[in-house]
């Protein structure tokens, strides 16, 4: 991960990315590490240090390790309302529940939830649980860049 002042993106397989911002923040998108066949082994064994967790939807290959990463970092999770409430039941203390089109400032960054076309449910004891609409993220970084 890059030092302060630079933007760095590290792909950890499938849809899991670590983002290091110019201001020194560390974010993880759709943290699926342990069961992710494309995730490097060293990342499966350790929980990355992050300031913010962003989860796009409720499929296990996107939300799989979100609760563990958030709990171990005491990091807030940004996602749809239903998904955040479900993560609270998994022991996540800090959530930023949102709806599509909403914008918040969290960890010094502006986050906007945008529409995505996909399904969004997880299997909990083999019964599907709807976890809100799928979403994407628009981030405004500390230096004003938008990604």
Region annotations inferred by a language model:
Residues 18-59, 64-71, 82, 120-129:
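Pre-active-site segment of Zn-dependent metallo-hydrolases
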Residues 2, 10-12, 88, 95-97, ...:
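Short solvent-exposed loop/turn micro-motifs enriched in small/polar/acidic residues
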Residues 113-146:
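Active-site-proximal loop/helix segment associated with metal-binding centers of metalloenzymes
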Residues 47-49, 106, 132-134:
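Short connector loops at helix/strand junctions that flank enzyme active sites
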Residues 1-26, 33-38, 105-117, 125-126:
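Zn-dependent metallo-beta-lactamase
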Residues 11, 55, 76-79:
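Conserved SAM-binding loop
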Residues 14-16, 101, 132-136:
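Short hydrophobic/aromatic beta-strand or adjacent loop that forms the aromatic wall/cage
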Residues 68, 72-73, 77, 81-85, ...:
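Portal/gating segments that form or line small-molecule/metal binding sites
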